[in-house]
Each structure stands twice: as structure tokens, then as C-alpha cells.
């Protein structure tokens, strides 16, 4: 029989920030969820994807899914 898929779910969080009305910078809070095979990919994922909060393509970096 075939082995069960060894992929993990990871969270890709936007690196974009937005200035609030009080003047402080905060993350947009937008994220994507992707599958990743830890045996093939040892480094952290980074993608340039669309962030609808800032309406631009920005860098998304991998974080652990809680």
C-alpha cells in the first residue's frame, strides 16, 4: 500500500503593513494556507502574492499554523 501523504499545512503571512488612524504601523493580517512537503523543502517558503487589504502584490512568509 502507498504511504499516507507526508505534507504539512503552513500559514503564509503578508509582510505588508498599514498605518492606522493613531499613526502606528500594523500588519494587514491577511494570510494564505499552503501544503508543504518537509522532506523535499527544508527552507521556509516565500511567495509574492496579492494582498487585497493593501491592493498590491507583496511578499508572504511562512509561519507555523496554530
Curated annotation (Swiss-Prot):
Pfam families: Ribosomal_L33. GO terms for cellular component: cytoplasm; large ribosomal subunit. One of its GO terms (molecular function) is structural constituent of ribosome. GO terms for biological process: translation. Transmembrane segments: none annotated. The keyword Nucleus does not apply. Keywords: Ribonucleoprotein, Ribosomal protein. InterPro entries: Ribosomal_bL33 (IPR001705), Ribosomal_bL33_CS (IPR018264), Ribosomal_bL33_sf (IPR038584), Ribosomal_zn-bd (IPR011332). Coiled coil: none annotated. HAMAP family: Ribosomal_bL33. Belongs to the bacterial ribosomal protein bL33 family. This is Large ribosomal subunit protein bL33.
